[in-house]
Amino acid sequence: MKIAIFTVVLALAVFAVLSFGWEANEKALSEEFTELIHEKEAASETEARECRYFWGECHDHMPCCDWLVCRYKWPITYNICVWNRTFPEK
């Protein structure tokens, strides 16, 4: 009987140690994934366009391309670039 109880307690201790290790590994992977996302986001910001394309979000500091105009369109809660009914000259 004592051996069975000792075995159960030992097994629970092993499971506790293993789960702690898995949790630490999972947290490390989560942090690594978050850093990777931030790096990709920073890389895409450096490749920002000079103008916003069709249906792109626009503001004073983010102008639309020449053949588009910045308008508020309901139900969208921000301004978007829409066609101004002209064609760009090439």
Swiss-Prot record:
MF-aspect GO terms: ion channel inhibitor activity; toxin activity
Residues annotated as signal peptide: 1-19
Keywords: Disulfide bond, Ion channel impairing toxin, Knottin, Secreted, Signal, Toxin
Disulfide links within the chain: 51-65, 58-70, 64-81
UniProt tissue specificity: Expressed by the venom gland.
Propeptide: 20-50
Compartments reported by the entry: Secreted
GO cellular component: extracellular region
Domain notes: The presence of a 'disulfide through disulfide knot' structurally defines this protein as a knottin.
Protein family (similarity comment): Belongs to the neurotoxin 10 (Hwtx-1) family. 13 (Hntx-13) subfamily.
Protein's job: Ion channel inhibitor.
Protein name: U7-theraphotoxin-Hhn1a 2
